[in-house]
Structure formats: structure tokens, C-alpha cells
Design a protein with these regions (language model features):
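Divalent metal-coordination and catalytic microenvironments
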Residues: 35, 50, 55, 77, ...
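Polyanionic/metal-chelating signatures
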Residues: 132-281
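His/Asp/Glu-enriched, well-ordered alpha-helical/loop segment
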Residues: 96-97, 103-114, 122, 252, ...
């Protein structure tokens, strides 16, 4: 999408009027009354009211006066929660294509392909968001009100951004709460520098063409960034320049590490370069919780749980290791919680955003407390992203991201009745 079309899309979204609000002038005021309210940051209110206007929560409590003219939702039998936060998603992200050289002929060609493909620290997710993407609206319909938009590919992948899944009407007011002045979609950028690994990321015969090769490449990239920091006469490198905040400890480094071995490699690299580590796509953590705690590492746990391959015959046997991995995947969050490791959840790899909550429900069925699961979906995620003062709980002055359910959030039969992003209602299909 061109910059002109993106700006036009922002304009059209910003000035659309929600159903039932035509009698009001912006900012629109809503009140959900007589509901069970779960702020996350405090005690549950069994019969309370939450009021929000212009995208910001104005009052939460059991004795709240509803402003005249507010759009009121009767909350009897309903529960209000903070909106869910998905800490690993490509929804709405339209990153530029990874450069590829056709038939590289020389070592120099191969080196250029390798560097251009794998060293993209300067790629900012915030610069490539499409606010009208259907993937964002589908996430919002599933109760996900904010995502950590994460650049894909491998090597030094780029910088993530915390973004809303919809844009409200009062952009100047909401923009005051955000870092990105181009509109109300981006809440905070950058959140982290992301590092990934793969078996053969460079393609063809280019180095690195193995797992150990890409690990060596990542390490060399940080060594190059250190050299760049100290060198006096140096050619400009946008990628190495973008790595400087990470080396200085001002920007966390998010390592994609699913297995215990990968986690330990990531922690070793973080220690060697004095980085502030976050582990993403985590799945096997039982053996490394003490190491995670000692390194003060935060974890973004994958809710893309392994499933039985559809191509297998119903009576086909599977290796014990595969069965064990599938059984243990939903148990990891309880292990992290017991160890006192701060963690949140990500959906990366899930085809349906609704499975994000469904699989979070499975972690509760496998030993994680409801309170811990809710925090991982809301306030812990916001804190991990450096935005705990803006979203993640129902508190006065925070952005009005919330979901309203008929039943307990972790009951698989519960239905989401209302979703508000940036204080505006999301149309549910």
C-alpha cells in the first residue's frame, strides 16, 4: 500500500461514526453499567460501571455516575476485561520483500545477498503497517485489541512495534498517549530488536546455509555493531546503526528460541554482548526456568501448539517424542509462573486469531491459574512491551481497550459480546 493510500485510509477510519452514536459529537462517551468488572490491576468489582470517552477510560468502580448522553450498555450477566494483547503477530504488517540476487556469480555477490537478507536491524514494523488489513480486523473480532507487530524472516530481523488492531476517532487525543505521531495505530516503537534462526535462510549456496551458520552470522553481526560503535572512519550502515541501542542496553533483544537448547544459546549471546533478553516463540522451558530467572529474561510463550498432522491415518503411530511435545506444550506457562518468570503469549503461526484465546484456555486446563493467564494476556504483555502505563488493565487514564464476555473468559463456552479498541466498538461477525 502506498503512503498516499495509507494516509487516506487513516483519514477515513478516523472520521467514521459508530452505529448508535450519531446523536453525539466526538469524543464519543460509553458506559457499561451493572457488570462484573475485572480490572486486572486490582480487585474484581462484582457490580460496577466503566465509563470511557474519546478512547480513554474515565472511571471504573461500583459507584460511578454515568455522564448525560453516554451510550449505555446494560452489563447485567456480563463481565468486562481489558482487551487481549498478542505479543507476536504479523497481522497488518506489509514488510518489504527480502532482497534476492538472481544467479549470484561471485563471492562478493553471495556476501551481499547474505547481508541484505539476514541483516535488517533497521527494518521498523511501525513503518509498514496497513491499518485496513483484514488480518487486523479479524484479530480485533477475536478480542485481541493490540499486537506486537514483529518482522519476519531470520537473522537480525528488525524492530517490533506495539500497535492497536483498530483506530479510534479522536486521533489527537489518542496520539498524545502514543509514540508515533502519524496516527493512533502505533502505541510504542521500537519495542525490541528481533533475532531469529533457520536451517537455510540465505538460499542457494550462500553462507550461512546451516543452523550453526546462521547462529555464527548473528554473533558476527553484533561484533560488527560493536566495531561500528568504536570505529572513527566507517561507511554508514543503517543496520549497524540500528543495533546501537540494543548494545547500549536501551532496547531489548528478542531471540526466537523454541527449545531449551535454543534458549540457552540465546542467553549465552545476551550475556556475551550484555543485551537485555526476551525469549520469543518459547515452547520447551521446563529445564531452563532457573537460567531465565537468573538472566532476568522475559518470555513470550507460543500458543501455536503442535497438533497431529491431518495427513496421518487415524490409526498411524507417532514417535513418543512428538506425543510428549504435544502434551507438554500447554503446560509450559504454569512452569514459568511457578518460577516467577514474567511471560506473555503470542499467536505467531496460528491461522485463526480465535485460537489465541482457545489455546490460552488450554494453559489454564493444564495447571496455570486463571489470574496468571489473564495477566499474561493483558497487563504482563503490556509491561513486557513497555506500555503498562497505557494499556493492559482497566484503570482511569488508560486507553479504552476492553472486551465484554458472557461468562468467564477461560470457559470454552464463553462468548465475546462486545470489543472496544481505542474506545470504539468493533463490529463482531
Amino acid at each position: 500500500m502506498s503512503r498516499t493510500l495509507r494516509v487516506l485510509a487513516l483519514f477515513l477510519i478516523a472520521f467514521s461514526v459508530p452505529s448508535g452514536a450519531s446523536q453525539q459529537e466526538a469524543p464519543y462517551t460509553y458506559a457499561i453499567t451493572g457488570a462484573r468488572i475485572v480490572p486486572v490491576s486490582g480487585a474484581t468489582i462484582e457490580n460496577g460501571t466503566v465509563v470511557f470517552s474519546g478512547g480513554v477510560i474515565g472511571a471504573v468502580g461500583s459507584n460511578v455516575t454515568v455522564p448525560a448522553g453516554a451510550i449505555t450498555i446494560a452489563g447485567k450477566g456480563l463481565t468486562v476485561y481489558p482487551g487481549l494483547i498478542d505479543m507476536g503477530s504479523s497481522a497488518g504488517l506489509e514488510a518489504p520483500a527480502i532482497p534476492r540476487a538472481e544467479n549470484p556469480q561471485t563471492t562478493e555477490d553471495n556476501e551481499r545477498v547474505k547481508r541484505d537478507t539476514l541483516l535488517r536491524a533497521h527494518l521498523r514494523a511501525a513503518d509498514h503497517m496497513n491499518p485496513t488489513a483484514s488480518s487486523l480486523s479479524k484479530s480485533a473480532e477475536a478480542g485481541i485489541t493490540a499486537i506486537l507487530a514483529t518482522p519476519g524472516s531470520d537473522g537480525i530481523r528488525g524492530q517490533s512495534a506495539l500497535v492497536l488492531t483498530s483506530i479510534g476517532a479522536d486521533l489527537p487525543q489518542i496520539g498524545a498517549l502514543a509514540d508515533d505521531r502519524r496516527g493512533g495505530l502505533v502505541l510504542r516503537t521500537p519495542v525490541a530488536l528481533h533475532v531469529g534462526t533457520a536451517d537455510s535462510p540465505a538460499g542457494g549456496n550462500a553462507y550461512p546455509n546451516s543452523l550453526m551458520g546462521i547462529i555464527a552470522f548473528n554473533r558476527q553481526a553484533f561484533l560488527d555493531a560493536q566495531w561500528y560503535q568504536q570505529a572513527k572512519n566507517r561507511p554508514h550502515s543503517a543496520a549497524l546503526e540500528a543495533m546501537q541501542p540494543a548494545l547500549a542496553g536501551r532496547l531489548p533483544v528478542a531471540f526466537r528460541a523454541s527449545t531449551s537448547r535454543e534458549v540457552m544459546r540465546a542467553l549465552d549471546m545476551a550475556k556475551a554482548f550484555k543485551l537485555d533478553p526476551i525469549i520469543t516463540a518459547a515452547r520447551q522451558v521446563d529445564d531452563v526456568t532457573a537460567d531465565l530467572k537468573a538472566a532476568n529474561a522475559r518470555v513470550i510463550y507460543s500458543l501455536n501448539f503442535p497438533t497431529r498432522r491431518p495427513s496421518l491415518a487415524p490409526d498411524a503411530d507417532e514417535p513418543l517424542s512428538v506425543l510428549r511435545e504435544r502434551a507438554n506444550a500447554p503446560k509450559g506457562p504454569a512452569v514459568l509462573d511457578k518460577a516467577g518468570v514474567l511471560f506473555a503469549f503470542e499467536s505467531a503461526g496460528l491461522s485463526d486469531p480465535k485460537d489465541f484465546l482457545k489455546n490460552a484456555q488450554k494453559t489454564v486446563a493444564n495447571g496455570l491459574s486463571k489470574d496468571a493467564a489473564l495477566k499474561a494476556l493483558t497487563l504482563n504483555a503490556a509491561t513486557l512491551a513497555g506500555a503498562g502505563d497505557r494499556i493492559g488493565s482497566l484503570d482511569r487514564g488508560k486507553i479504552a481497550n476492553l472486551i465484554v464476555t458472557e461468562g468467564d473468559l477461560f470457559d470454552e463456552k464463553t462468548a465475546i459480546k462486545h470489543v472496544f479498541v481505542n474506545g470504539r466498538p468493533v463490529k463482531l461477525n
